[in-house]
Amino acid sequence: MNSNANNTPIAIGISQVFPCSYLDGQQEQLLVIQEETLDPILFERLLAIGFRRSGSAIYKPRCPRCSACQPIRVPIQEFVPSKRQKRTLAHNRDLTWRITTEHTETQYALYEKYIRERHFDGPMYPPSKAQYEQFLFCHWLPPTFIEVYDDNRLVAVAVTDTLPNSFSAIYSYFDPDEERRSLGVLLILLQCRLAKLQGKAFLYLGYQIDANRKMSYKRLYRPYQILTHQGWEYSQVC
């Protein structure tokens, strides 16, 4: 693959096959960018062809017998919140939010609580600071944190990459004791709002996996586009 207008090649490797963490009985295999450092423009080009970031690693599924992972993005300037999403915004009017690139112990403490109480049966359990930093941080692209507060108490965090023409949602976590607030929904809506204010074209949400119920929420932000063999296409599948 060529990395820029000068046709400088970049190396792409392929991982071993290992059990899929999203679909029982399936096997996973990844294409992995082998470069130690990328620039935001190149990374955004890779997002547009289906790659994702985890830590400093850039990868794309290339599974032997499965194509369930569908890259999904929201065209921000066309996005309109649904009635339910508008109710979520109204219900959380009492909360405040701020944008920072600072990493704090309070953020990690909330992440640890979230994983212990909401994902104790998943691959991210048990949480650790080393795992947290390896998963979210990238030495060539510092992430942006959208923090949500109830008075002075941190209740939710969205971790996102800010790129020239888009946002890329990396991960969101929140206080499990505040489940009635639908903070996961709120965090995506805040990313949409911020992206629109900054004139971005897209919010990349990662991979939509229809067969995994926990991943189905990504289709709720409309309109959205799915990356197919023909390119990015609008979809109305619920």
Curated annotation (Swiss-Prot):
It holds the Pfam family ATE_N. It is an enzyme of class 2 (transferase). Keywords: Acyltransferase, Cytoplasm, Transferase. GO terms for cellular component: cytoplasm. Signal peptide: none annotated. It is found in: Cytoplasm. GO terms for biological process: proteasomal protein catabolic process; ubiquitin-dependent protein catabolic process via the N-end rule pathway. It catalyses: N-terminal L-glutamyl-[protein] + L-leucyl-tRNA(Leu) = N-terminal L-leucyl-L-glutamyl-[protein] + tRNA(Leu) + H(+); N-terminal L-aspartyl-[protein] + L-leucyl-tRNA(Leu) = N-terminal L-leucyl-L-aspartyl-[protein] + tRNA(Leu) + H(+). One of its GO terms (molecular function) is leucyl-tRNA--protein transferase activity. Disulfide bonds: none annotated. Its EC number is 2.3.2.29. SUPFAM superfamilies: Acyl-CoA N-acyltransferases (Nat) (SSF55729). PANTHER family: ARGININE-TRNA-PROTEIN TRANSFERASE 1 (PTHR21367), ARGINYL-TRNA--PROTEIN TRANSFERASE 1 (PTHR21367:SF1). NCBIfam families: PRK01305.1-3 (NF002342), PRK01305.2-2 (NF002345), PRK01305.2-3 (NF002346), PRK01305.2-4 (NF002347). Belongs to the R-transferase family. Bpt subfamily. Functions in the N-end rule pathway of protein degradation where it conjugates Leu from its aminoacyl-tRNA to the N-termini of proteins containing an N-terminal aspartate or glutamate. This is Aspartate/glutamate leucyltransferase.
